[in-house]
């Protein structure tokens, strides 16, 4: 995307052109964009010439003025590809100037004002050893795809500080100070004509040949207050991977404020940042509006909005495209290894019936916000239930809360009059695109197991009449998600930080859905969150079937037709047991229907269980994908490449967009132009 003549017969490195001519916006001549663009493996015609889909056109000038060779070959539509790894992320909202405690007075002048110096502090995450250097009044140069920054003078840069891998690391260099008052007023801000950045934080990966040149760049400006003090303002962030520079853009509405440490967050602010679509207030939001980048719609409402309106419901600005982002998680088999390679799915169709056909084998669709932030609205009232079983996975198992796409109807209900917890005869089944669905053969096997257990129930009834409560009658059912300790890499989605070997690294939330049968069987599906990209818009929805019976999972591989879990009182509290007295059973040992309310009599939504998610409750917000325990909420970013698509049959220069996600994350992107 650029001048056609400059790309036909000349190599990228041999082009003779001014440094600030063709690849600046607006260009001095010709067009910056071509007539089409490629997203998610599908070609789209540009409906708005010279229109940047992901932000302001002026943002393109941060990508650099010279092209480089794009290092990736264009994959076939059916060929899986790896997502980009984002090993470093600087949380730009944490960047600040801290006034030094010791102020230097000007020598020889009495009564002069003390000279104020500042330290620079910020928080960052890294999945590898990293070297961080700060530059002031610096220009940017690319040599072999690796950026370098040259300050105006040698004293306008800090010493290089080395850090090991880790999450939520604090950069604080007391011996390095900066005094913005020494600079002219025009040097405090960024001027495109001068191409001088007031402040640059350059973090470079120092390990692994495969990560050579991998770096993260934070550019910032200074602002002077009325009292003479200064503050620093983040300008832009870039990620350099394999010699390609990607511009990071925020996605608004993807952060999780329920895990915020700030107790002063207003309730209405929390409600504004809930997971529900702002139009229907029921389905989970998964569609991004471009170019304003508000993630506020579900795919069904977005499909309707295309034909009824042309303005964003949040900012009321006209939009030109809708981008659906579907997160998927991998459901490994019983003998599958812990690590895996993420893939990007092929383009999907517009029909929801065909949505499941484009889900890669072994993956299932989950809520994007749940995948990034963990459970959004855990209920504080219901204690977590533990299922009976022989094997237990280490670590906590947070539930998905009461989200409409992810909730599982609880079969337990408290009854008045001092009666114990009783088991319902009819259990409603909720089927959605984010819930685990049992196959028909599993249903038949579960029903056959229930028939086998009928003589056992009669025996238990006789034993209960004699004052003995059989252990097999102590039943618990639970629906929970778990966070896998393994972590991987890559915003979009965003600049995310994680590592398959480091349990402390941040990653997209990896979850487990488990259901315990009425015979105390625990079936857990360990899953890893992945993400895929696809180039067509996919309308999604949710179907619910009330009054159905949720079958129990098939018996474990031990070979016994039923597993009778046994828990000691110290291991499981009494509220987790369900006792059915003999008087409440009929002659065949079944629970009588009069004692229990039908699903149609339930008013309101079932309350989700309280659980700990992978984000520590009580942490400040930040704008990265950090979902390791003890980490904070996150804000995903979208990456855009500065490299023209030479191998995409497009002769013009522009930014190749890319989604920077974790290695175990697949984000399904569907785009539909308006």
UniProtKB/Swiss-Prot annotation:
Chain positions of all zinc fingers (RING-type): 277-316
UniProt keyword annotations, A-Z: Cytoplasm, Metal-binding, Transferase, Ubl conjugation pathway, Zinc, Zinc-finger
Biased composition (Polar residues): 469-508, 527-537
EC numbers for this chain: 2.3.2.27
Feature: compositional bias, Low complexity: 509-526
InterPro entries, alphabetized: MGRN1/RNF157-like, Znf_RING, Znf_RING/FYVE/PHD
Regions of compositional bias (Acidic residues) in chain numbering: 583-604
Highest taxon listed in the record's lineage: Eukaryota
Main location: cytoplasm
Enzyme class: transferase
GO biological process: protein ubiquitination
Leader peptide range in chain numbering: none
Gene Ontology cellular component terms for the protein in this record: cytoplasm
Entry's localization field: Cytoplasm
PANTHER family: E3 UBIQUITIN LIGASE RNF157 (PTHR22996:SF1), MAHOGUNIN (PTHR22996)
Protein name: E3 ubiquitin ligase Rnf157
Source lineage: Eukaryota, Metazoa, Chordata, Craniata, Vertebrata
